[in-house]
Regions:
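Residue-level detector of conserved catalytic or cofactor/ligand-binding positions
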Residues: 255-269
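Hydrophobic residues in alpha-helical segments
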Residues: 64, 68-69, 196, 244, ...
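Generic alpha-helical transmembrane segments
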Residues: 237-241
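Membrane-cytosol interface segments of multi-pass membrane proteins
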Residues: 1-170, 258-261
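Aromatic-enriched alpha-helical transmembrane segments of multi-pass intramembrane proteins
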Residues: 10, 53, 110-133, 144-236, ...
Length: 269
């Protein structure tokens, strides 16, 4: 089958990355600018991490879903590739942080960071490269990806798993007191990406203007209702669906494509 690349997803991912950088810059600067955009919109960019979860699951499915189900993948190569891609630069950041902290606790945490499996630790355990929690969560997703593919092997099972993940998201907040750093809390976003992958052929026939309208409405509702999980899930899903439909335009301009991360996993094999 000819490989298909969803180029607009690269642009969407890069816009989300810029948004998260803006959020961190606002949180750490020493000056104040009044206005709705500065006080409400930019802080909400922290929830772009949920879009990354949905896009990551979709991209992984494009690259590996069929290979996993057909037993056509070398897991040594799969995980080795991810260690080689993530660890060198992250290791440098961790070592610099440990050197600046120079405490026994930072050494323990640095060790956990360098294994890349610190996503299994309880929330708020790691302060060395504390913002790297998302990397830990994504690596947990990589580790359970074979099971993830089994969960979405067919649409019926995928919908059942998605329903269970929504319940988990609710009870994680209301009872277990864990948040987005936990894989069970965030599972619904990854499964949403998997479901969108399963329906990608049907989605290709959607009217992009109608989807754009739904996307705009969902973003407005997000700011009216609030950044609850269900709204983050809705916005992330419709943005991904629109990116699948959209070719060219602002999501696929040369500047964004040049600065976007490697799109290799977003090729459908």
């Amino acid at each position: 089958m000819e490989k298909k690349h969803y180029g607009a997803i690269d642009g969407l991912r890069m816009i989300a990355a810029f948004g998260i950088v803006m959020m961190h810059m606002r949180a750490n600067n020493n000056y104040e600018i009044s206005g709705f955009v500065y006080n409400n919109v930019i802080p909400s960019f922290t929830n772009f991490v949920f879009l990354f979860m949905t896009v990551s699951a979709f991209g992984m499915c494009c690259g590996y879903y069929q290979k996993v189900l057909n037993n056509q993948i070398s897991w040594s190569d799969f995980y080795g590739k991810r260690f080689k891609k993530i660890l060198p630069f992250f290791c440098l950041l961790v070592l610099l942080d440990v050197a600046m902290s120079h405490s026994l606790g930072s050494i323990y945490e640095g060790f956990a960071d360098l294994t890349l499996v610190f996503g299994f630790l309880p929330a708020d355990t790691i302060s060395v490269i504390g913002v790297g929690w998302f990397l830990g969560l994504i690596f947990v997703f990589y580790l359970i990806f074979p099971f993830f593919c089994v969960l979405i092997e067919n649409k019926r099972r995928a919908w059942m798993a998605f329903g269970v993940s929504l319940i988990y998201n609710f009870i994680c907040t209301s009872y277990f007191d864990v948040g987005r750093t936990n894989i069970l809390y965030s599972a619904c976003f990854f499964l949403a990406g998997g479901l969108i992958y399963l329906y990608r052929e049907q989605i290709a026939h959607f009217n992009q203007w109608i989807v754009l309208g739904i996307t705009c409405i969902s973003i407005i509702l997000y700011y009216v209702i609030g950044g609850y999980s269900v709204m983050c899930l809705l916005v992330s899903s419709v943005l991904l669906i629109y990116a699948i439909l959209k070719a060219g335009g602002v999501l696929q301009n040369s500047c964004l494509l040049y600065t976007s991360p490697s799109p290799r996993d977003a090729h459908e094999s």
